[in-house]
Amino acid sequence: ASFNPGKVILLGHSFGGRVIIKLMNRAGLPFAVDKIILVDSAGIRPKRSLKYKLKVLSYKAAKAALGFAPVRLLFPDALENYRKRMGSADYAAASPIMRQTLVKVVNEDLTALLSSIKAPALLVWGVNDTATPLADGKLMEKLIPDAGLVQIADAGHYSFLEQPFIFNRVMKSFLQMEEGV
């Protein structure tokens, strides 16, 4: 029995975009992907500033100090409170094993996979996105062979929530392309 889902269009926001990039590079998918839409997508490892590197170094030092047995006995919640203050909301809410996974995933650079994406790709980016900067979208547009980038003004990482009317118009236009509608 063959699997035929019909027309397949994948849409992913942030981490979902990362999943699509990996999926599009997987050999032997049981279906063809007609189009992809990456919205404020993750996947490009950011260039780390000196400020960021110092923050990581200070976090590791604090983690070592707060994890020291006598300190842990005196201040049992100090390390967890520090983690919650320093990390993202996702990181703070995650279990210890999931935290390790998050760190590995966030640091994985998928740039080399972009040029292998064969499906037409729409990239939608909030101009003010700080989680996955617009520069990432511009790089993806250059590297994905059949990609176009739409920049949404007055929007950040959740461009589809911050500018829903514009976002929906862009979606409708892309989805109707080549259908003669």
Regions found by a protein language model. Give the residues of each.
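Conserved acidic catalytic loop of the alpha/beta-hydrolase fold
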Residues: 1-8
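Conserved alpha/beta-hydrolase "nucleophile elbow" surrounding the catalytic nucleophile
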Residues: 8, 12-17, 126
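Flexible "cap/lid" loop of the alpha/beta hydrolase fold
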Residues: 18-26, 31-68
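Short beta-strand/loop motif that positions the catalytic acidic residue
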Residues: 116-117, 123-125, 129
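Conserved alpha/beta-hydrolase "acid-adjacent" motif
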Residues: 130-136
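Catalytic histidine-centered segment of alpha/beta-hydrolase-like enzymes
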Residues: 155-169
